[in-house]
Design a protein with these regions (language model features):
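Selected alpha-helical membrane-embedding segments in polytopic membrane proteins
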Residues: 2-90
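Membrane-water interface of alpha-helical transmembrane segments
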Residues: 4-8, 12, 93-96, 100, ...
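Hydrophobic core segments of alpha-helical transmembrane domains in multi-pass membrane proteins
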Residues: 38-46, 101-107, 147-156
Length: 169
């Protein structure tokens, strides 16, 4: 029970942002067929970081003071930095690999979160995303890869965030 009230709120916030961008990119790819819409992914940190303090402010009771809360925050901060920087690099040197990398990193961060929380659902969801969704991307048309990211955001961010908030009550 090493949780602050609403400790999962940041995960829910970022999960919703990722889900909305995933659906937007997917719809635009389907409607236009232009892969340039993939650059919208960079809108996640551009929109998310300024909105984050406004949306989450005051909802996390003690600001993540426990070891577990700090560790989980650091896991996801590292994911955000790695995913943003590497996606930026890959967009120019190997754009076809960006989705695989991002989904694999998302799964890895979720697995680490599950291990830290000793939560088998979150751990399993991370493995499904990191391994299953990454492999599945090889079989989907490029236009459908954002749907893997949408599923991953629900499985690895939104649902675990809700679980964490309920566990803290």
């Amino acid at each position: 029970k090493d949780f602050e009230k609403n400790a999962g709120t940041p995960m829910i916030f970022w999960g919703v942002i990722v889900l909305l961008f995933s659906l937007a990119v997917w719809m635009l790819l389907i409607l236009t067929g232009k892969l340039e819409w993939n650059f919208l992914w960079f809108g996640i940190p551009v929109i998310g970081w300024p909105l984050y303090p406004m949306v989450v402010k005051g909802r996390c009771k003690s600001g993540g003071k426990s070891f577990i809360s700090r560790s989980i925050g650091q896991i996801w901060l590292a994911y955000g930095i790695f995913a943003t920087v590497l996606a930026g690099v890959f967009a120019f040197i190997a754009p076809h690999l960006t989705g695989y990398l991002t989904v694999a990193l998302l799964g890895y961060a979720a697995v680490m979160t599950g291990f830290a929380l000793k939560n088998n659902y979150i751990t399993a969801g991370g493995f499904i995303t990191g391994l299953g969704c990454t492999v599945a991307l090889f079989f989907f048309e490029k236009e459908f890869s954002p749907l893997c990211v949408a599923v991953a955001s629900i499985l690895n961010l939104i649902v675990p965030g809700i679980m964490m908030n309920r566990r803290a009550k």
